């Protein structure tokens, strides 16, 4: 059996109980007449179970099926093996066309116009009144006699068929025409499907090699596994959907019953049309004949055409497209991005051999396609001269380096929004940064897969005589499977999900819920499973070349690492750490042995976690023995410093270097000046003594001599010294006086002398015009202010006031010439310290240092980044 009406089950569920055991009701499609469907049986039981009544057509169908084997024997004896194979191949093609085209056309017209049902009603085929006696018939009683005889014959034959098939209690005339038409339709379906199946099996049997060596190998073992799996799929599908969906019942009438998903319908979309044909490929493996494989591919492909043009349109008309608000979330986000950003256009995406969303006004699209064209043409024109070893290294390195680059961007973007910040601080928008990422990611995919295609193609071309045709076709099938997976993934998560939009535009997400529609209903991470099967297909196509195996392993590992260690943690952070069980997972866990293994693993995991937690508690128990105030070192440090000062005063009572109010304030927030009091014995004082400001981390190595430059952060102790260094040093000396025993003074370091960098600093008193240290002050902290960022106006006001005090603002624009210590980097640090964002120097120069533009831009960036948090 090769078909089943499956999409009904996938859209709204599947009946899981026999109609004979529950009270199932049905109604006609157009007239809404309700009725209870009769009990029916599957195809094999109807035709071959001797305990069931058989109609004339069923007997003829059974004889036709059995006769195929006698015909095969007779033709084989008379005309030989090759003729017999082609004879049954032609038969199979005929019945396959009768199935997909014949049944397809019948169902198409039945779906759109209820053609079969209306024909039965028009000609009173299931009515008690004969056609030529029906006063209400739409046909005139003067119709020609042949037509009357024909329809009377059809009427009698159809009624006889149903009576001979159904139990005695079945009242033919009590049921609407829809159910009776469906029962007759089933007979022709039985004939076509069984003939399709039997002729294919005979053709395959005639193609099996005679040598036992050719049969007993790994291919045959894999083929048997696929066949057994195919049988389970068919049996489980019929268990779930029953005859109603198996025979396309909803084209005739609609059942009203409780529907649920179950079994094989949790594993794959359209299982009877997808994994339900794996037996074809299992038989092709056993035969090891590429002709059988091509026939199987034709049969499978025609079934997909039937699904696309017959079943899916009917399902969408009858039940809707099956999408809900959650499944459309990413698509709505794409629309919202386009709506709010008029210069945004959908990104170029490579799907298989085609490109979507090409924009003729976007240079990067030409660059991407041009790269593909150049690589392909170069490979074709220079195929004879290309060294495959060098090409392999090129593919490997390109894939690895580009993956590291992509993964780094995603990781840093997840951790700190690094990529978005990079563009925001340079004056670009959040969406613009996302557009650049879209180009980078798509170009990465296009470049790596183009190189893989070129390398695989040259491998096949250079070693074509050793290539197995069956392996080549199977490899192409795997490539097609990966292409289908990519398309289904993009269909389910839209462009926003395909380009990791929740890494870059999480503020556009309104519902924190992962999609479970489409391919994500069956697999949690389809790109990690099916997203690399095409690469493994190249391994088959190249007859298991070692280099292709290495590339396939690289593709698989990089894919796995990206999903496991970057994508999954980010998804948990954005959507919550909710465990989503895929359809495949549900089905596997439904198997008792696997469920027991899962329970054992969970118990072991719980035991390990509990033991680790207990050990952590024990290792931290010693901390409770420490004094309660042990971690508070501030008061202790103050006491130590006072004791050291007391000792220094006793040794040299007139040596002193203290910051004003240092007991009260040890943290000076810019632009607050720092005033320093100094005292020096008269015999040690030199008019050229000077005081420098240093970072503690730079001077801690030597307490007797300063070995780093002050960088201009210094002041004289006397207004009369260092006359050639300008007024700045004179203005910093605010007081100086001398007595018989000592000289004392006061020096103020304002914004013209201070550092504009957060850190721990100290003052050093130097003897004369040298770097010999006489006194060192208590370390203190200098920090940039935190400006008010409540509103952009308040932020601008505070920023303007600060820049004015620092003397770097003129006509509302930043001018660093006013203070050599407050440059562009200091302004960037001030903004970052206040609002948490960083603007690039290039951007601030581009806006001419306009304080209004800079403050509002920084505030906008903060709002954007806050929305991404």
From Swiss-Prot:
Residues 77-86, 209-212, 266, 384-389, 461-463, 556-869 are cytoplasmic. GO terms for biological process: methylation; phosphatidylcholine biosynthetic process. Its main location: endoplasmic reticulum. It is found in: Endoplasmic reticulum membrane. PROSITE patterns: SAM_CHO2 (PS51598). GO terms for molecular function: phosphatidylethanolamine N-methyltransferase activity. The chain crosses the membrane at residues 56-76, 87-107, 188-208, 213-233, 245-265, 267-287, 363-383, 390-410, 440-460, 464-484, 535-555. It is a multi-pass membrane protein. The modification N-acetylserine is found at residue 2. Pathway: Phospholipid metabolism; phosphatidylcholine biosynthesis. Residues 2-55, 108-187, 234-244, 288-362, 411-439, 485-534 are lumenal. Keywords: Acetylation, Endoplasmic reticulum, Lipid biosynthesis, Lipid metabolism, Membrane, Methyltransferase, Phospholipid biosynthesis, Phospholipid metabolism, S-adenosyl-L-methionine, Transferase, Transmembrane, Transmembrane helix. It catalyses: a 1,2-diacyl-sn-glycero-3-phosphoethanolamine + S-adenosyl-L-methionine = a 1,2-diacyl-sn-glycero-3-phospho-N-methylethanolamine + S-adenosyl-L-homocysteine + H(+). Disulfide bonds: none annotated. Its EC number is 2.1.1.17. Belongs to the class VI-like SAM-binding methyltransferase superfamily. CHO2 family. This is Phosphatidylethanolamine N-methyltransferase. It comes from Saccharomyces cerevisiae (strain RM11-1a). The gene is CHO2.
């Amino acid at each position: 059996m090769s078909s089943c009406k499956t999409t009904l089950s996938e859209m709204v569920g599947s009946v899981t109980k026999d109609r004979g055991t529950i009270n199932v009701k049905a109604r006609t499609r157009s007239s809404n007449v309700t009725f209870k469907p009769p009990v029916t049986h599957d195809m094999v039981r109807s035709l071959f179970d001797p305990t069931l009544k058989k109609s004339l057509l069923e007997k003829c169908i059974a004889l036709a099926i059995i006769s195929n084997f006698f015909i095969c024997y007779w033709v084989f004896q008379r005309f030989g093996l090759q003729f017999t194979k082609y004879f049954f191949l032609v038969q199979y093609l005929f019945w396959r066309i009768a199935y997909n085209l014949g049944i397809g056309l019948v169902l198409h017209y039945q779906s759109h116009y209820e053609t079969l049902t209306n024909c039965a009603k028009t000609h009173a085929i299931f009515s008690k009144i004969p056609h030529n006696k029906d006063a209400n018939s739409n046909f005139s009683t003067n119709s020609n006699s042949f037509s009357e005889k024909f329809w009377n014959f059809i009427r009698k034959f159809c009624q006889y068929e149903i009576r001979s098939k159904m139990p005695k209690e079945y009242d033919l005339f009590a049921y609407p025409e829809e159910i009776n038409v469906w029962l007759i339709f089933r007979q022709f379906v039985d004939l076509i499907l069984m003939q399709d199946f039997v002729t294919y099996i005979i053709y395959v049997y005639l193609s099996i090699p005679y040598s036992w060596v050719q049969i007993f190998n790994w291919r045959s073992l894999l083929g048997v596994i696929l066949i057994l799996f195919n049988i389970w799929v068919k049996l489980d599908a019929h268990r779930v959907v029953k005859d109603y969906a198996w025979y396309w019942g909803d084209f005739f009438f609609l059942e009203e019953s409780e529907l649920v998903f179950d079994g094989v319908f949790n594993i794959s979309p359209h299982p009877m049309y997808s994994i339900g044909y794996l037996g074809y490929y299992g038989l092709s493996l056993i035969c090891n004949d590429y002709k059988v494989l091509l026939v199987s591919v034709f049969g499978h492909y025609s079934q997909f055409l039937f699904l696309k043009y017959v079943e899916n349109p009917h399902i969408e008309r009858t039940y809707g497209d099956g999408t809900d608000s959650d499944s459309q979330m990413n698509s709505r986000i794409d629309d919202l991005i386009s709506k709010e950003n008029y210069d945004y256009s959908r990104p170029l995406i490579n799907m298989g051999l085609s490109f979507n969303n090409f924009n003729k006004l976007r240079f990067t699209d030409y660059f991407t396609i041009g790269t593909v064209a150049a690589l392909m043409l170069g490979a074709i024109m220079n195929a004879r001269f290309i060294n495959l070893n060098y090409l392999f290294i090129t593919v490997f390195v390109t894939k690895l380096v580009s993956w590291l680059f992509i993964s780094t961007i995603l990781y840093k973007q997840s951790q700190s929004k690094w990529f978005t910040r990079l563009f925001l601080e340079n004056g670009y928008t959040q969406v613009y940064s996302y557009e650049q990422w879209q180009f980078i990611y798509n170009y990465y995919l296009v470049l790596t897969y183009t190189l893989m295609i070129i390398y695989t193609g040259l491998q096949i071309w250079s070693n074509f005589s050793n290539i197995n045709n069956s392996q080549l076709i199977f490899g192409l099938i795997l490539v097609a499977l990966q292409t289908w997976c990519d398309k289904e993934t993009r269909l389910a998560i839209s462009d926003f999900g395909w380009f990791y939009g929740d890494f870059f535009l999480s503020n556009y997400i309104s519902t924190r819920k992962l999609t479970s529609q489409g391919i994500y209903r069956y697999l949690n991470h389809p790109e990690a499973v099916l997203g690399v099967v095409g690469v493994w297909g190249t391994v088959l196509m190249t007859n298991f070349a070692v280099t292709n195996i290495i590339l396939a392993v690289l593709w698989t590992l990089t894919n796995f690492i990206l999903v496991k260690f970057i994508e999954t943690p980010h998804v948990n952070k954005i959507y919550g750490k909710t465990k989503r069980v895929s359809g495949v997972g549900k089905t596997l866990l439904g198997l008792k042995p696997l469920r027991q293994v899962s329970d054992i693993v969970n118990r072991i995991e719980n035991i390990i976690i509990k033991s680790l937690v207990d050990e952590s508690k024990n290792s931290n128990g010693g901390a409770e023995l420490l004094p309660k105030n042990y971690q508070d070192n501030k008061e202790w440090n103050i006491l130590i410093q006072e004791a050291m000062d007391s000792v220094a005063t006793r040794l040299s009572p007139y040596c002193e270097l203290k910051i004003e109010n240092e007991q009260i304030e040890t943290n000076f927030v810019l632009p607050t000046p720092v005033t320093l009091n100094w005292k020096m014995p008269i015999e040690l004082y030199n008019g050229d003594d000077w005081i420098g400001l240093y970072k503690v981390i730079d001077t801690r190595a030597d307490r007797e001599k300063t070995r780093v430059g002050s960088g201009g952060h210094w002041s004289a102790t006397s207004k009369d010294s260092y006359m050639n260094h300008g007024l700045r040093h004179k203005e910093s000396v605010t007081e100086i006086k001398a007595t018989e025993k000592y000289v004392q003074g006061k020096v103020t370091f304002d914004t013209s002398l201070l550092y504009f960098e957060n850190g721990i600093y100290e003052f050093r008193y130097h003897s004369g015009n040298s770097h010999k240290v006489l006194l060192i002050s208590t370390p203190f902290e200098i920090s940039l202010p935190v400006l008010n960022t409540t509103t952009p106006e308040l932020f601008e006001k505070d920023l303007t006031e600060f820049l004015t005090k620092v003397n770097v603002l003129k006509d509302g624009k930043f001018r660093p010439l006013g203070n050599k210590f407050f440059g562009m980097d200091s302004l960037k640090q001030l903004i970052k310290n206040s609002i948490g964002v960083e603007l690039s120097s290039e951007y601030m120069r581009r806006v001419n240092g306009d304080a209004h533009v800079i403050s509002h831009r920084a505030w906008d960036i903060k709002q954007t980044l806050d929305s991404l948090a």
